[in-house]
Structures are given as C-alpha cells and as structure tokens.
Amino acid sequence: YSIAHQISRNENMLDLRIFGLYGPGEDYRYKFISNAIVKALLGLPITIAQNVVFDYLYIADFVRLVEKLLDCDWPYRHMNITPTKSIDLVSLAEIINEVTGNKAGITVLNPGWNTEYTGDNRKLLEVVGPFDFTSYREGIRELAVYYQSVWDSLDLDVVRADPFLDKCIVKR
C-alpha cells in the first residue's frame, strides 16, 4: 500500500500490474507454460494441480508495451498490463500439446476452478492505443523453439520429477 501511495504522488513513477508473464528467461522448472512445454517436448503428460483462468502476457509484448509507455504521458499511475484475452490452464496445455505434437495427454489433479487471476486492460489500451498482442499459440510456438535451442542446458531430471507441483495452491 505504501509503495502504491508513493507512486500515486510521483509523476515519474508508474505501477504496471502484471498478472502472468511468460517467455524465454523464466524458470522452466516451475513456471507453468515453460514447464509444460519442456514436458511436452519430453513426451510427458502435462499435469495441472487445478484449472484456473489467467492473463498471461508474452515477454515480447511486455517489452513493446513498456517501450510505448516510455514515449507517452500517463494519465494513470497504476495500470494492469495484461492481454485482452484470458485463458485457462487446460486450454494452454491443449495448445502446447498441439504445437509440440505431444500425445501424452493432460492430467488435472483437483476438480473445479481455482480463483481467476485476470485484470482489466482498458486503461493500458487507452494510453498506448490499439495493440496487437501475440496469440497464445504463437507465443508458445516461439517458446518451444527457444527451449529446443537450449535443450542441452536444461535440467530435465527436475522437469521429470516435478517437485514444484505439490507447492501449487488448490481451492477446495
């Protein structure tokens, strides 16, 4: 709260609220999209603790948005920096399996839906204007190509063991 208050009072500061970010450089051992891509490339099933809807923003879009924001006035000090289309984890896993050709399937461990983690990006689009967000399919395709290019540097044993899965919070 105190940081948000400081940002509100300082015209040189901007609070960009990120709801989900994916792309090269994130920790593939536990970040869902990257972890699922590496699992799919291994031919493993994609395991989801519980389905949930997210606003995942591709890193290249984040960079382009920040560049645009550096070149304009900010009528708002706090903005959600999210894509226009939200997506659930099962749908992401289906796209990942299609893009990678993985036939091992998708497992959801707990029924129901977890708490949605999305935001309204109307203020952002009001400031930067129309923006062409990378589709989830294209972002996943680019990320799969990236992981194939760094394959020998990945700790595949950790991906296979999936020690972070039990750290997921499940809504009962």
Residue ranges of model-derived segments:
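Active-site Tyr-X1-5-Lys
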Residues: 1-17, 40-41
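Glycine/proline-rich active-site loop of Rossmann-fold NAD(P)-dependent oxidoreductases
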Residues: 2, 22-34, 42-44, 59-60, ...
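Substrate-binding strand-loop-helix patch
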Residues: 24-30, 51-63, 79-98, 115-117, ...
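Generic structural signal for alpha-helix termini and adjacent loop/cap motifs
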Residues: 39-43, 69-73, 127, 146-150
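Hydrophobic aliphatic residues
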Residues: 40-41, 96, 100
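C-terminal "lid/loop" region of Rossmann-like NAD(P)-dependent oxidoreductases
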Residues: 51, 76-79, 90-93, 101-122, ...
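Hydrophobic "lid"/C-terminal helical patch
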Residues: 66-70, 93-96, 121, 140-147
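Amphipathic terminal alpha-helices
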Residues: 136-172
